[in-house]
From Swiss-Prot:
Keywords assigned by UniProt, alphabetized: Chromosome, Nucleus, Phosphoprotein, Telomere
Nucleus in keyword set: yes
Composition bias type Basic residues, residue spans: 409-420
Post-translational modification Phosphoserine, affected residues: 227
Known partners and oligomeric status: Component of the Set1C/COMPASS complex which consists of SET1(2), BRE2(2), SPP1(2), SDC1(1), SHG1(1), SWD1(1), SWD2(1), and SWD3(1). Interacts directly with SDC1.
GO molecular function, one term: transcription cis-regulatory region binding
Protein name as catalogued: COMPASS component BRE2
Binding site for DNA: 318
Role summary: Component of the Set1C/COMPASS complex that specifically mono-, di- and trimethylates histone H3 to form H3K4me1/2/3, which subsequently plays a role in telomere length maintenance and transcription elongation regulation. COMPASS recognizes ubiquitinated H2B on one face of the nucleosome which stimulates the methylation of H3 on the opposing face.
Amino acid sequence: MKLGIIPYQEGTDIVYKNALQGQQEGKRPNLPQMEATHQIKSSVQGTSYEFVRTEDIPLNRRHFVYRPCSANPFFTILGYGCTEYPFDHSGMSVMDRSEGLSISRDGNDLVSVPDQYGWRTARSDVCIKEGMTYWEVEVIRGGNKKFADGVNNKENADDSVDEVQSGIYEKMHKQVNDTPHLRFGVCRREASLEAPVGFDVYGYGIRDISLESIHEGKLNCVLENGSPLKEGDKIGFLLSLPSIHTQIKQAKEFTKRRIFALNSHMDTMNEPWREDAENGPSRKKLKQETTNKEFQRALLEDIEYNDVVRDQIAIRYKNQLFFEATDYVKTTKPEYYSSDKRERQDYYQLEDSYLAIFQNGKYLGKAFENLKPLLPPFSELQYNEKFYLGYWQHGEARDESNDKNTTSAKKKKQQQKKKKGLILRNKYVNNNKLGYYPTISCFNGGTARIISEEDKLEYLDQIRSAYCVDGNSKVNTLDTLYKEQIAEDIVWDIIDELEQIALQQ
């Protein structure tokens, strides 16, 4: 096993060294310890649900992500491979959620928060990268039936001054804040889990009280013929994203424009009149800014669009095995801009992408269109830029001279002349987790169930008959993508092991 990899513990780790060939049974790690938080009783179904909170496991926060892993003695160098908790199907992630949000004791499809809790959010364990995907969310506790009835009655009456003065709107506002609520939608890795989905630019959400669309914290009424949700309602989501090939083509074009803008900015900084004007500390600062821009250009030129880079390490936390990796962070606008406005507008949209909404099988419309792209360089990992910039400046030089007859002094001079910085690690990489995640946010006792299995999706056949009009169209379910995701993890585990073996030779 590679030096630095944590050793196995035969009594607790999942190791099959002594198992006979053909008798090795796959086993997933046990669920972590659970602490009971509260109970919810559905007024529609009359069923009580018990909710728990996990103990002694790390949650995804502070730009670090975790997932369970298992010992694999067939991986002689890496030693460990990806695994999942023993759930029967996809659902809400155990680790990719706010600490204040609870999950059902009996499965991973129900999420809730206790009464008097503010907004808490959880993401699904399925990453949607391309194509059309459909899922449903059932309201267990949320919405506001009284408010919905009040709105319907209000539509049949005229707004009078007396009604406004009587404080009807203030009463409605208080009623909204004192009742359970939900928000649903999709978000990216960068979205905060301590705020409702749609709070920032990385999420797209729907309100349960009015079915308003929320993005960047702004409300929009784009859905038609919808009514406020009540318990028992099922909201259908159809997310359509362009193919990975189309997204890569867009990312490449955007990278070219950013490199061109960087070069133009650097040419302006290096003009002779500016060097003469800048002296002393200002000249040193100018040189440092130029070096930083050169490093940014090197990172952009180093992007591998078709590769997956998973910089994850196995750790043992309270006698449990996890993979730890850095997560994607919120990106800031570059310090440079070209005169082409498309750098900031057209290339920040996924063409023909949308999120369509259905209420109990009834089509309400497209809540969002032209979603934000996510492949590098639109997304970037947490990155110690100062450290990697220093390595790029002072790292070992690449020996690009193939002339064996060259004298050592001349060869050394050529080597210094052709010296190039080494990029130890790039922040513009795809770790196979870039995509949009189905998301649920709960408030003040709000409770919802995500439905991902094909046989439990009540309106799936209706959706497929409407959207699969030709042989090229296909509507996936979350459970199907979940199984494909597991298969991809196995493949990339093997590829990572083979790459490490090749590096050792």
